[in-house]
């Protein structure tokens, strides 16, 4: 099998070789195609071979022919009739035949030899021809090399010539390019000198570009010959061109200005919103804007090339704005003057209309400027400030003469809110100059407000002289309450009459009844408010202070407001205190104190919404040490020039330096402090009004006991204690009958005066939580006075019979009495008797006569986070009450939380 496979593969290879050999000599697409020269050479060789082989034939063919000839000879011999009779004949014939055969046999070789010889000669000739051809080829090769060398050298020389030509062309082009910057000066200058040449011509831009390029070239190449001279020429050309542009723009602006300032201007006033005025003052300039904008655009695009363009643009800005100032100044001044006449007496309307007019003028001028120019200019802001200064010069005399704070506050609001916040915020670029002038006006208004506010605070608050009606308390409150009750009754009667018309059985009647009930409850809740809560019932200085602060809050800066608010609140507190003192003189101290408490609460409540710190830092110098140091210096005169550490002068300089003291003044704390003090006074006066006899007796008894103890200090210890215990009992004013009468008098005061006190508190305060907070320490002081009296009697040898005669009520009995004796049965959210106390003489016996403090402490949460505990003195009894409860503001908000 392997042999068969091998044979197959060999046969396949042979076939492949044969096919490839056949493909060598294919006429179409041979494997080794010959060139035309090669084919011609082969054909020539084939022809020469064909000619050489044609005379002779192949030796084998000749031998065959020879054999044929021999056969022919034998045949001819047979046919010739020759007779061989003898051996001699045969031998002769044979020899002849043999000779012929030999001859014929040698002829073949001779012929072949001759052919070979001929071929040798031909080969020699061919070799000679080949040698000749080789010589010719060698000669041709040498000649080709020679020609190639010559051609290469010629080509290299041509390339060198071309390079030299290119280099020379480049040098010539560079020379022409450089000479271009020098050769155009005269032609440009002649064209600029041509009177018919205009700036509006299209070639003017090309001339400007050429001048800029030439100047830049001279600047970059200062070492070139005559570069400085040609730079001067081109600068002269540039000056001529800029002068032409300046004259061109100036003529356009001057013509537009002359047309506006013509006779038709007097017929058209510059009124706000006038279309004719806008067309007159802006139409001519807007029509000229495209021609000027083309020139200014070229200038603005070349600002970085030369200083002349910057100077030219600044001159054009100045020319444009000067023409606009000539047109607008008198017009704006006349328009504002007309507005001042139109709004004479109404300063707010004048400020609003004049500022609105200037806003439109500034926006129009800004828009017109950018129709002529692309970039802004500081001169535009200065020009706009000049126009707005007319507004400032017109309005400032009115502002500095305004005395009314509300008018000044309204003007301040107009300038700050309407102008700065609304207009300037949304158009900051066009209204930049207007904003500066308005800010100056605002500062003037604020300064005027501060000055007038100080005068107002001094004249109308601090030095306010109340009329009889202002101090008619509580008559005013009672009258307003009666009016409110009458209005409430009328409202209820009308509601009852309306509800009686509708049938009570229908669904509609039930709805009407529910509505009437809700209205009745609402009317009752409204009627429960005190007339003192009405804005018109506030004391005038309180109302004026709050109105003044509300006006100033949004008008002036925070630092100025803090200073003025500190002064205003101090003056208001002093004014309210003076009014309360006058009410106390005319009526009672309770009325004066309740009046002051109510208005201080109003003041504290109304200043709470102001989101500003009412704290003001005051800096002062303390010279107290200077006096001491000077005195020591006089005592140490001998040590003035001492060289040691005891130099008196040095000590004076060190110790006598004034100290800088900083003090924080908080208006809110001043109000709280004054409110706390007034509440303490009210609690003290109310307590003395109800249990004054008991408090006076306790003070007298304690003084008597102290005097007895001082006089009996020389006695023995036991006897001294016995005499001290009997000293009060033996005194005439401390007899049980006298003490009993004092107690009865105090109880009568409680029964007769407590209702009036609660009535006054309800009338003035009109807040049950506030009334409850104020009444609680009074209640505790009353109970504490009876408890203290009981302790005093127990510790000073009063017998049970004496105590029976005295009949001092216990704390529970006084609590029940206070709860039963009130105006409406409840004060505050719960009855006054809701606070439970269990204090009696027996319960105090285990305390060794120590003073018992009623459990009345409460905790109140404040926004400020302060929980300071203060002492409110009422008689001789000290009761702890938080400062927040004394200020009672958080009680009004219902944030009281029992501890």
Curated annotation (Swiss-Prot):
Transmembrane segments: none annotated. Keywords: Golgi apparatus, Membrane, Protein transport, Transport. GO terms for cellular component: cis-Golgi network; Golgi membrane; Golgi transport complex. InterPro entries: COG3_C, COG3_N, COG_su3. GO terms for biological process: endoplasmic reticulum to Golgi vesicle-mediated transport; Golgi organization; intra-Golgi vesicle-mediated transport; intracellular protein transport. It is found in: Golgi apparatus membrane. It is a peripheral membrane protein. Belongs to the COG3 family. Component of the conserved oligomeric Golgi complex which is composed of eight different subunits and is required for normal Golgi morphology and localization. Involved in ER-Golgi transport. This is Conserved oligomeric Golgi complex subunit 3. It comes from Aedes aegypti (Yellowfever mosquito).
């Amino acid at each position: 099998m392997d042999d068969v496979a091998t044979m197959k593969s060999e046969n396949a290879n042979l076939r492949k070789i044969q096919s490839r050999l056949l493909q060598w000599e294919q006429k179409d697409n041979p494997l080794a195609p010959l060139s035309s020269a090669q084919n011609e050479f082969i054909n020539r060789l084939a022809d020469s071979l064909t000619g050489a082989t044609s005379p002779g034939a192949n030796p084998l063919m000749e031998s065959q022919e020879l054999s044929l000839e021999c056969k022919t000879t034998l045949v001819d011999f047979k046919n010739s009739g020759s007779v061989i009779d003898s051996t001699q004949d045969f031998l002769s014939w044979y020899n002849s035949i043999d000779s012929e055969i030999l001859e014929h046999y040698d002829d073949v070789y001779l012929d072949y030899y001759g052919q070979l010889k001929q071929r040798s000669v031909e080969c020699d000739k061919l070799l000679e021809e080949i040698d000749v051809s080789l010589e010719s080829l060698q000669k041709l090769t040498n000649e080709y090399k020679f020609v190639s060398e010559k051609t290469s050298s010629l080509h290299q020389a041509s390339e060198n010539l071309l390079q030299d030509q290119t280099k020379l062309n480049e040098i010539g082009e560079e020379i022409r390019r450089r000479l271009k910057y020098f050769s155009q000066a005269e032609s440009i200058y002649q064209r600029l000198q041509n009177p018919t040449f205009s700036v509006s011509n299209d070639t003017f831009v090309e001339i400007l570009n050429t001048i800029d390029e030439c100047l830049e070239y001279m600047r970059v190449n200062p070492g070139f010959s005559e570069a400085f001279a040609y730079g001067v020429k081109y600068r002269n050309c540039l000056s001529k061109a800029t002068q032409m542009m300046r004259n061109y723009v100036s003529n356009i602006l001057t013509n537009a200005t002359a047309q506006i300032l013509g006779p038709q201007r007097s017929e058209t006033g510059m009124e706000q919103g006038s279309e004719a005025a806008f067309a007159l003052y802006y139409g001519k300039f807007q029509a000229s804007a495209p021609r000027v904008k083309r020139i200014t655009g070229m200038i603005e695009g070349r600002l970085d090339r030369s200083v002349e363009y910057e100077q030219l643009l600044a001159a054009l800005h100045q020319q444009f704005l000067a023409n606009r100032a000539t047109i607008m100044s008198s017009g704006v001044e006349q328009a504002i003057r007309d507005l001042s006449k139109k709004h004479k007496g109404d300063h707010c309307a004048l400020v609003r209309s004049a500022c609105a007019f200037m806003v439109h003028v500034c926006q129009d001028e800004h828009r017109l400027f950018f129709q002529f120019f692309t970039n802004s200019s500081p001169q535009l802001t200065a020009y706009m400030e000049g126009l707005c200064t007319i507004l400032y010069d017109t309005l400032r005399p009115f502002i500095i003469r305004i005395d009314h704070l509300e008018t000044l506050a309204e003007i301040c609001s107009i300038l700050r809110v309407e102008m700065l916040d609304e207009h300037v915020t949304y158009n900051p670029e066009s209204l930049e100059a207007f904003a500066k002038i308005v800010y100056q006006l605002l500062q003037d208004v604020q300064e005027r407000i501060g000055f007038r506010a100080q005068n107002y605070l001094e004249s109308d608050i601090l030095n306010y002289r109340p009329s009889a009606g202002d101090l008619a308390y509580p008559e005013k409150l009672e009258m307003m309450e009666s009016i409110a009750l009458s209005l409430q009754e009328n409202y209820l009667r009308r509601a009852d009459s309306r509800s009686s018309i509708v049938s009570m059985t229908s669904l509609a009647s039930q709805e009407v009844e529910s509505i009437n009930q809700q209205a009745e409850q609402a009317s009752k809740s409204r009627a429960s408010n005190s007339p003192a809560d009405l804005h018109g019932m506030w004391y005038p200085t309180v109302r004026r202070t709050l109105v003044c602060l509300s006006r100033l809050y949004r008008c002036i800066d925070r630092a100025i407001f803090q200073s003025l608010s500190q002064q205003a609140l101090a003056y208001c507190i002093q004014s309210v205190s003076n009014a309360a003192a006058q009410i106390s003189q005319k009526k009672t101290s309770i009325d004066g104190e309740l009046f002051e408490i109510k208005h201080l609460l109003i003041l504290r409540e109304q200043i709470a919404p102001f989101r500003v710190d009412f704290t003001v830092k005051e800096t002062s110098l303390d010279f107290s040490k200077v006096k001491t140091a000077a005195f020591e210096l006089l005592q140490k005169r001998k040590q003035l020039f001492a060289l040691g550490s005891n130099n008196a002068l040095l000590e004076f300089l060190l110790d006598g330096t004034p100290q800088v003291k900083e003090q924080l003044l908080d208006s809110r704390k001043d109000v709280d402090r004054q409110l706390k003090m007034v509440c303490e006074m009210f609690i003290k006066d109310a307590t003395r009004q109800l249990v004054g006899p008991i408090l006076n007796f306790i003070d007298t008894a304690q003084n008597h006991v102290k005097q007895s103890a001082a006089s009996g200090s020389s006695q023995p210890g036991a006897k001294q204690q016995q005499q001290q215990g009997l000293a009060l009992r033996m005194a005439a004013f401390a007899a049980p009958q006298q003490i009993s009468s004092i107690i009865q008098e105090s109880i009568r005061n409680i029964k007769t005066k407590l209702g009036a006190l609660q009535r006054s508190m309800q009338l003035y305060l009109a807040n049950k939580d506030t009334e409850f907070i104020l009444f609680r320490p009074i209640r505790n002081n009353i109970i504490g006075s009876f408890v203290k009296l009981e302790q005093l009697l127990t510790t000073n040898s009063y017998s049970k019979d004496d105590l029976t005669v005295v009949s001092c009520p216990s704390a529970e009995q006084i609590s029940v009495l206070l709860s039963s004796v009130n105006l409406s049965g409840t004060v505050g959210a719960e009855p006054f008797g809701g606070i439970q106390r269990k204090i009696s003489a027996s319960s105090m016996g285990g305390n060794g006569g120590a003073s018992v403090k009623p459990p009345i402490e409460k905790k109140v949460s404040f926004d400020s986070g302060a929980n300071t505990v203060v002492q409110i003195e009422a008689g001789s009894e000290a009761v702890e009450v938080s400062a927040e409860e004394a200020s009672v503001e958080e009680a009004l908000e219902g944030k009281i939380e029992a501890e």
